Swiss-Prot record:
Gene Ontology molecular function: rRNA binding; structural constituent of ribosome; tRNA binding
Species whose genome carries this gene: Streptococcus pneumoniae serotype 4 (strain ATCC BAA-334 / TIGR4)
Keyword Ion transport in record: no
Protein name: Small ribosomal subunit protein uS12
Signal peptide positions (record): none
Length: 137
């Protein structure tokens, strides 16, 4: 326990909260070619690479991912949720935050049903999370 005098000399420091999705907290001014300090809930980007990767132990699968260059010129890895997708190189995608626990380095999700990304076909439940329209009765 510090003495009052020690606290007067060197006060307590508050913890710095680190963002879990840092690329969404950076804007870009293309006229001045300078990064700005503007946060956004989603960001648009262009897929530069689409592929699969294997998860950490103890899981086993081929998880779909895309390497995306965002509108603020930062390049990140994003997960493609749902069964099947139509993404390829140069597809324009919308990104949201949210990591994938068993894929190291994947801190973002691609929003299904927005921009060039199609919704998941034949999905009946939880459709809003996968950009699927209501089926005709």
């Amino acid at each position: 326990m510090p003495t009052i005098n020690q606290l007067v000399r060197k006060p307590r420091k508050s913890k710095v909260e680190k963002s879990k999705s840092p690329a969404l907290n950076v804007g870009y001014n293309s006229h001045k070619k300078v990064q700005t300090n503007v946060s956004s809930p989603q960001k648009r980007g262009v897929a530069t690479r689409v592929g699969t990767m294997t998860p950490k132990k103890p899981n086993s699968a081929l998880r779909k991912f895309a390497r995306v260059r965002l509108s603020n010129l930062i390049e990140v890895t994003a997960y493609i949720p749902g069964i099947g997708h139509n993404l390829q190189e140069h597809s324009v995608v919308l990104l949201r935050g949210g990591r994938v626990k068993d894929l190291p380095g994947v801190r973002y999700h691609i929003v299904r049903g927005a921009l060039d990304t199609a919704g998941v076909n034949d999905r009946k439940q939880g459709r809003s999370k996968y950009g699927t329209k209501r089926p005709k009765a």
